[in-house]
Amino acid sequence: MSSFIKGNARFSVLTEGCIRIEYALDRCFADDPTLFAVRSSFCQAEITEDKDTLTVKTKKLTLRYTGSEPFSRDNLSVAVHTSGKDTIWHYGDESRNNLGSTLSTLDGVNGERPLPDGILSRDGFYVIDDSGKPLLHDGWLKARPGEHKTDLYFFAYGTDYKSALRDLSYVSGKMEMPRKYFMGSWYSRWWPYTSDEFLAIADEYALHDFPLDIMVMDMDWHYQDWSHREGHPRALFGYGHAGENIGWTGYTWNRTLIPDPEKLIDSLHKKGLKVVLNDHPADGIRDHDEMYSDFIADLKSKGYKEEVPTVEEKVSAAERENLSRNIENYRFNAGNRDYMETFFKNAHRRIEKQGVDFWWLDWQQDRIYPHVHNMPGLLHLPWLNHLYYENSKSGNKRGMSFSRWGGIGDHKHPAYFSGDAATGWETLAFEIKMTATAGNIGCFWWSHDIGGFFDPVPGGQAECYVRWVQ
């Protein structure tokens, strides 16, 4: 077993090309997994001490740490032995020749954007910083002790980029095989379709002998403000989105458009289609939703009390105008296990029993509260991607998710969609580049809105649309 403690530092050799580097003030190191790292088994290495210097050597790298002080450029270095020459990294050095990876989303993007780092670099090495990120214990988040200051993963590979991706998969976990039908043809349009219109679309595909495998129902499958009619259930609590539409989140079928959801889903299944529902969960289950009473009762039976502070400047006008109702609603709380288990039970499981095959997580609410409650530094998106993917495995099915890219380590939760990009030649060119470089961080399954999402091309967009299809 190749793990060695020197003072407050621990070095763990995970593969010939990857070493974990930790520093903890109390010498209590982290063995639980994180959203990024899942492996803790070790690879053999040659470990020696000469006076005050520790040397850890494998076929691909040699690490040297002198003294016992916190890491600095002067006391920690790694030599990379690949491609016939040594490249030296000192603590704090940045990747100067990185080949890039991919953006989390193309929301609002119109043209080229800088790409974040991937694991592949012409430098022949890369460092992933997992410092401060929450641990996973018994399937849930656990804050990392404040004394655990540094947690780095050094990848050494030279020009052998395949070995870098192989080591990434070993350390962070392999990407599971997606469901077969995911590879098929999808139909998705943000439009208030009726049941008859959904069925007509499926029939038209069949009439033209064009394959269709997945029918996506965007936000209008549930009641929401823009299509609100007198007598419809209406949200009066929440932050909302896009001009204070607080019906952006919802879990009650719009019976005007889809009077019999089970019948519609069954009909689509008989036509060979899978059914996916759009989900903006940021406002959670509220009192206008048909499962509200069960949801509240379940939460109270677990002793749950509101713990997410209200962001006053983001509260919708509708909520402010209806404070006198005194109806109990809870803010969405992805950081609380009782809340999320109750949410999945009362929203997702109930609707999945009607035949829905999986969910499209359309998270856009980082503007309100980017970080998971009680977990500083953890964005909602990677954590929700993990939760949604794991919850999609019910009934012994393969996991299936559809969301924006959550960053390093999120390759374990396929697949991804790039969001609301502008229509235009510059965006198309960048999208092609970004899709290719996504592989540099293990993001292998990208879906894009064909033709973009907003802004027409001056002079017509027919050719741009056709090129997008290509």
Predicted feature residues:
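A low-complexity, Ser/Thr/Gly/Pro-enriched, surface-exposed linker/loop concept
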Residues: 14-52
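Glycine-rich, histidine-containing beta strand-loop boundary motifs that form or position
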Residues: 15, 23, 58-60, 65-67, ...
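Active-site-proximal substrate-binding groove within the catalytic cores of carbohydrate-active enzymes
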Residues: 21, 111-153, 162-165, 173, ...
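Short, solvent-exposed loop/turn and secondary-structure capping segments
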Residues: 32, 66-68, 75-77, 129-131, ...
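Catalytic and substrate-binding clefts that recognize carbohydrates or anionic sugar/phosphate headgroups
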Residues: 48-182, 188-191, 195-196, 202-207
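Aromatic-lined carbohydrate-binding/catalytic grooves of carbohydrate-active enzymes
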Residues: 176-371
